Amino acid sequence: MLYLREDFQKAWEGQNPQDVVETMDGEVYRALEARRTYRFELNGNGFFAKVHGGVGWMEILENLLHFRAPVLGARNEWEALERLHSLNIDTMTPVAYGETGSNPATQRSFLVTEELEGMITLEDFCKPWNKTPPPFLLKLAMVKKLATISKTIHNNGLNHRDYYLCHFMMPDVLSPDPDNLTFYMIDLHRAQLRTETPLRWRIKDLSGLYYSAMDVGITRKDLFRFIKIYTGLPLREALTQYESMWQAIEKKAQKLYQRMARKLPSNS
């Protein structure tokens, strides 16, 4: 499959798009054995390219042995972006996508998206909150926004698998109206799509989000607000009906927090 927006059709006319992205110079943000992410410019505009090489049979088998779906290339993220746009969830804008080869171990692919300019991650935005709490209405609006996004994607068969505050971006200049927030979901290369999101993957996403918010002054009331919106139920009913899920989320988030704390330098 190949998709090129009109400006990329003109820029890459007569060339093999996969070869173009594999040989293009840019500011490298991440370089792994089978995936490279870099920034480049075209016609004065910024873009990000994720270029995937073949992952190899060992990587595929390792994932299957652990009952995980292997990420073979850019298709995951391309399809996740399509799903998010259909749900009116703000995210990256794809401008070019291609996939070459039918062998899953050697398949090559790429995805190019528009740069999100003037943004800050929610993780960085919320870091000062533990010492300097935000305005109540802003925090309330952000909790509502995250709960609504989480409910929407999970109820429509999408789970992120790396669902942390750092994978949401927002404008670094806030709207004066707290209820007019815009969050952009990013880094969807491991996302999964189904007709329904299984419980285990809801737990993984929500425990990741909770873990990433533990050091920003999240209160019990904030959690309750999130739960009410996510379930669409009165609080008591939501806590009772999904008690085992909330317990699993709490346990998994605490375990992740403790594991990551052990990895930090002792003087952190």
Spell out what each predicted region is.
Residues 1-16, 40:
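N-terminal presequences and immediately downstream first alpha-helices
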Residues 14-122, 151, 155-156, 245, ...:
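Conserved ATP-binding subdomain of kinase catalytic cores across diverse folds
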Residues 102-107, 173-181:
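Short, solvent-exposed loop/turn segments that connect beta-strands within catalytic domains
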Residues 121-133:
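AlphaC helix of the protein kinase catalytic domain
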Residues 155-165:
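Catalytic-loop of the protein kinase fold
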Residues 163, 167-174:
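Hydrophobic residue at the +6 position relative to the catalytic HRD Asp in the kinase catalytic loop
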Residues 180-254, 258:
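C-lobe/activation-segment region of protein kinase-like
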